[in-house]
């Protein structure tokens, strides 16, 4: 019996060694197939959808998917030509991740842009920007937004929610550049667009691994394992 089990085990290991593996790759920015939204069923999924921001892009690229289900990541674009060259139209993707932080529910939303180019010759390949929506308790039917923190140049700025910067439960966010400074987020009073929402836990393991390990140059993935808590610390409002 032991000999049979050992033989079966060795055959299985040999089979595994012969199965071809597909390594994740860096691919063209417009070839990355984003994730479809999932039907929200958990408290965190429902809250992430409820408070999903609108994004108004005033200049530069619109959001693109950064990673696909197989873990392939976007190669981005060189900052050349028009600031929105080859990146002005796409369905896009918005990523989310939530947790309790200092007794407050934090929802981080993040967008990826293939390049950050204020004007030809300036900027860099890849851009990641994000916001943190601070909520009192996502379990409450009438959960309240306590503060909104938006990113820019490695820092976060907090603002209080009001009738001008919110549409119902959704923050109004702008993406823009004040020349010659690179792009950043701002609070807005204009309703922008939305993108398919995908949460960290709903990504495939390959996609999460890619976002944890891929070098996006001067841009950091704000919601991956190495940076998530660090960015929550920067975005804290009390």
Model-derived regions: residue spans:
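Bacterial N-terminal signal peptides that target proteins for export
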Residues: 1-8
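Bacterial N-terminal signal peptides
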Residues: 10-17
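Sec/Tat signal peptide C-region and signal peptidase I cleavage site
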Residues: 18-24
């Amino acid at each position: 019996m032991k000999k049979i089990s050992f033989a079966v085990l060795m055959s299985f290991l040999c089979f595994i060694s012969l199965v071809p593996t597909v390594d994740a790759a860096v691919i063209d920015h417009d070839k990355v197939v984003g994730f479809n939204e999932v039907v929200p069923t958990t408290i965190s999924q429902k809250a992430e959808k409820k408070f999903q921001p609108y994004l108004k892009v005033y200049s530069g690229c619109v959001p693109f998917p950064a990673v696909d289900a197989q873990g392939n990541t976007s190669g981005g674009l060189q900052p050349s030509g028009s600031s929105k060259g080859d990146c002005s139209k796409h369905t896009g993707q918005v990523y989310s991740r939530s947790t309790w932080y200092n007794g407050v529910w934090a929802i981080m939303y993040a967008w990826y842009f293939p390049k950050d180019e204020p004007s030809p010759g300036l900027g860099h390949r890849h851009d990641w920007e994000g916001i943190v929506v601070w909520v009192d308790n996502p379990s409450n039917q009438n959960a309240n937004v306590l503060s909104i923190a938006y990113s820019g140049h490695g820092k976060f700025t907090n603002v209080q929610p009001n009738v001008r910067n919110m549409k119902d439960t959704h923050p109004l966010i702008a993406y823009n550049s004040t020349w010659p400074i690179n792009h950043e987020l701002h609070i807005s009073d204009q309703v922008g667009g939305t993108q398919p929402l995908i949460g960290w836990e709903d990504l495939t393991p390959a996609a999460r691994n890619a976002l944890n390990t891929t070098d996006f140059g001067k841009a950091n993935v704000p919601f991956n394992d190495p940076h998530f808590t660090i960015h929550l610390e920067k975005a804290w409002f009390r």
